[in-house]
Amino acid sequence: MKFFIDTANVDEIKKAWEVGVIDGVTTNPSLLAKEGKEPVSLLKEICQIVDGPVSAEAVSLKYEDMLKESIELSKIHSNIVIKIPMTEDGLKTVRKLSQEGIKTNVTLVFSPTQALLAAKAGATYVSPFVGRLDDISHFGMELVRDIQIIFENYGFDTEVIVASIRNPLHVLEAARIGADIATIPYSVIKQLIKHPLTDIGIERFLKDWEKLKK
């Protein structure tokens, strides 16, 4: 299972990369805007840190504009993956980019059939948003299960990125299902590392060691 970090914050990316647990990065317009930096420069900086896929989202909604923007984004670095919204024009763009050898990540996927269409169009990745489905009383992980089954049935190479992860349980459930990738906020990565019994154990070992030194 691969872990991506869901952030555009350079410090968070550096810390997670140095720990050795992440394989890529996902960003979106909101995350980039939050950093208050020029987006292209920021994406270049991220690509210099992480030796893996870095998703950058096209904000245009019309096919011609989306395609043009996507091609420009792809020129930033060879690791850039173009994030495309799950719309009709988005699918057309994915199809064209796929034909040009440009990797894509279809985002805002909320149904198995949307994921199926994205895979048919040639998407490299699809991103089902589990947390947002949970927010409206739908079990988001059921969506991931359904997508996995469909992709296995038909031998699609498209990888599933479990997105909108809110807590460590989402990561555990994604791993149990066998999802290809989980994209995780830095705050949740820190939660995954820590456990109260680990802290208690370390404290006890240190106390016992200090007694020995006396």
Swiss-Prot record:
Q: Tell me which UniProt keywords the record has, alphabetically.
A: Cytoplasm, Pentose shunt, Schiff base, Transferase
GO molecular function annotation? aldehyde-lyase activity; transaldolase activity
Q: Which residues form the active site?
A: 83 (schiff-base intermediate with substrate)
Name a biological process GO annotation: carbohydrate metabolic process
**Keyword Transferase among UniProt keywords:** yes
**EC number(s) in its UniProt entry?**
2.2.1.2
Pathway(s) per entry: Carbohydrate degradation; pentose phosphate pathway; D-glyceraldehyde 3-phosphate and beta-D-fructose 6-phosphate from D-ribose 5-phosphate and D-xylulose 5-phosphate (non-oxidative stage): step 2/3
Q: Could you tell me where this protein is found in the cell?
A: Cytoplasm
Q: Which residues form a coiled coil?
A: none
Q: Say what the protein does.
A: Transaldolase is important for the balance of metabolites in the pentose-phosphate pathway.
The record's comment on protein family reads:
Belongs to the transaldolase family. Type 3B subfamily.
Identify this protein by name.
Answer: Probable transaldolase
Q: What is the lineage of its organism?
A: Bacteria, Pseudomonadati, Nitrospirota, Thermodesulfovibrionia, Thermodesulfovibrionales
